[in-house]
Amino acid sequence: MSMDFSALAQQFTEFYYNQFDTDRSQLGNLYRDQSMLTFETSQLQGAKDIVEKLVSLPFQKVQHRITTLDAQPASPNGDVLVMITGDLLIDDEQNAQRFSQVFHLMPEGNSYYVFNDIFRLNYSA
């Protein structure tokens, strides 16, 4: 693996959330037909359905603030697991919502794509 998995995770995370927060319709190139998204209780497969779900989310403005980022190699083939926690500011809400997200990144040529993506809001008990 040419890139350190921690550096890859950091670079991916910055790119993903910057793109999500500015124009989430452009995230499709990060997914493939076999990619899967679990968003709360919805499960979607394939780049087209995943992007349709992300675009359909009921907010105009969003800002992710990352609190923690953890990464591990996921296989001898160069896969990387990335777990993120943070705050989500939606539209003009003052109170942020906590979230967790896990990505399973798969190598493809000289880059990576999202094989699995699990997103969950974390509500207070």
From Swiss-Prot:
NTF2 domain: residues covered: 8-121
Molecular function, one GO term: nuclear import signal receptor activity
A Gene Ontology cellular-component term: cytoplasm
An annotated GO BP: protein import into nucleus
Keyword Transport: yes
One family name in Pfam for this protein: NTF2
SUPFAM superfamilies, per the entry: NTF2-like
Superkingdom: Eukaryota
Annotated InterPro entries: NTF2 (IPR045875), NTF2-like_dom_sf (IPR032710), NTF2_dom (IPR002075), Nuclear_transport_factor_2_euk (IPR018222)
Localization of this protein: Cytoplasm
Keyword Transport found: yes
Keyword terms: Cytoplasm, Protein transport, Transport
Main subcellular location: cytoplasm
Role: Facilitates protein transport into the nucleus. Could be part of a multicomponent system of cytosolic factors that assemble at the pore complex during nuclear import.
Protein name: Nuclear transport factor 2
